[in-house]
A protein has these predicted regions:
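Transmembrane beta-strand segments that form the barrel wall of outer-membrane beta-barrel proteins
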Residues: 3-7
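Long hydrophobic segments that form regular secondary structure
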Residues: 109, 113-114
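Surface-exposed loop/interface segments of Gram-negative outer-membrane beta-barrel transport/assembly proteins
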Residues: 10-17, 21, 25-103, 119-188
């Protein structure tokens, strides 16, 4: 069992990143004929104003007037860039994105008789990725204020069943396996 928590303020202004994660790996011999193996990974991440356009930052004139003193709108660079003011984009706009994820796997292995096993495996992957953003009319000249909300969810699961027979006779070894697998198409 392990866990980690990360809470950091990034190198750029108004940027923050948080992550919490829990991982569990358990292998248990429940009886002489049954083994249970479980793997679980759960996490949550949050990014506030993540991602920057580094080329836009590097191309902007370092000595230009940042804001129009009358309107409060962040000025465009008149010489080096056709993009909006990167500083204005950082301080006037707002964005949050999250990732909630759960990955699980379980295996029940039945020892039916000497050399014969049945493995019943199940796995599921779930993710939910909501994001929210606000674009301010102060970020650059002519910019309209706007908001955006988005959400994406995925759920995938799988069931795999293996029957395996292992035996040796003389100088020979035989392994025979039969597999049945179900992988549905999931849309959320």
């Amino acid at each position: 069992i392990s866990a980690n928590v990360l809470n950091m303020t990034a190198m750029t202004i108004t940027t923050k990143y948080q992550r919490a994660q829990l991982r569990i790996n358990l292998d248990n011999e429940l009886t002489k004929w049954l083994t249970l193996s479980t793997k679980i990974n759960a996490s949550r991440t949050h990014s506030h104003n993540g991602g920057i356009d580094i080329m836009n930052f590097l191309n902007y004139s370092p000595t230009m007037e940042m804001k129009d003193p009358v309107t409060g709108v962040y000025n465009m660079d008149p010489y080096n860039s056709v993009n909006g003011n990167p500083y204005g984009a950082r301080v006037a706009n707002y964005g949050d994105s999250y990732v909630y994820a759960l990955n699980t796997n379980m295996d029940l292995t039945f020892k039916i008789m000497k050399g014969l096993t049945l493995s019943v495996q199940g796995a599921a992957n779930y993710s939910h990725v909501p994001s929210y953003s606000f674009t301010s009319s102060l970020a650059k000249p002519g910019q309209l204020s706007g908001m955006e909300n988005a959400s994406r969810m995925n759920l995938f699961w799988q069931n795999t069943n293996n029957v395996t027979y292992n035996t040796s006779f003389g100088d020979h070894h035989l392994t025979a396996t039969a597999v049945f697998e179900v992988v549905p198409k999931a849309e959320i």
